[in-house]
């Protein structure tokens, strides 16, 4: 690993508000064919009000340093902590952005990876809310499909903090931005630990790895046990 470097962003966003406490934790980026990087980031507009705004920043990379070039639409909610921990995916020529919020996760899409439609609440294809809240979601693109990795309410999991287990995967309809309920599967079963903080590694067009560390064992029946780190390998026939 090389030395730690900082990405310099403008002092103000498009609305004229200051850009404060920028970070890109828990995000998925998209690397473009020309070497540019589409990096989702979040920031505060007010140091006294911890309400996040999320953007996608286009950056260049020269092999050592990441340099900001531009960013697109700015997305937030007025309540609580706003929209944060954004993750980006490219699928069939469009870009899809999922964002964490305290009450309900949100989703949007756009053509260029920078500018997006107004966000909407994540829902199943029957119109009911997905029930994912106050933790991150991530994308998987494999086998010609677009999938979401998430946790949610309503899975006999009221004993789990913020309903952060089990860890699910389901296919997304890219036209409606809804999760197809019949495709939902459990990636990692609930075992008295939280599973909300997962990661996705796209190995190839036909293989993706999901990693997830258990958390908060002290709150459940496995108190004083050692937590586990789970690895799930997803493959497709092409």
Where do the protein language model's features map onto the residues?
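Beta-rich carbohydrate-recognition and catalytic domains
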Residues: 1-22, 30-85, 89-131, 145, ...
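Beta-propeller and closely related beta-sheet repeat lectin domains
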Residues: 25-28, 84-87, 135-138, 194-199
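Active-site-adjacent segment of 2-oxoglutarate/Fe(II) JmjC oxygenases
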Residues: 139-142, 146
